[in-house]
């Protein structure tokens, strides 16, 4: 009986190993490229949001920054869990909507209304870039990728509307 059990467990383990090594095929090269680019893109949005939490007293901007951070952190973890996705070794400043190091530095130095203006304008640009990236995989055959891209597009379009409203306030 122990031998039968051992054979069953071994077979299950081996089939599990085979499934995990072939799970790479669940994600196309476009899906992987999307995740590997969106991870540093989201990381920069979180960095910008963390700067906002320190550099503004505007309750609307504070709330927006926290919402961005809360939404994008789990999305990063989800994309990192996809088979075949490798950690990025660059800051991604050449991707759509990414702020340059000098723009991030300027954001760090700004306070008050000047900060709010730079943050909102920069985050709108950042979100527009993320939407462009996400639109490239909306038709992915992988449901996780298609669902995440749709979520990113919808959430960031709503946040752009909110940021434009904040910019129009006196």
Regions found by a protein language model. Name each.
Residues 5, 18-170:
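All-alpha RGS (Regulator of G-protein Signaling) helical domain and cognate RGS-like helical scaffolds
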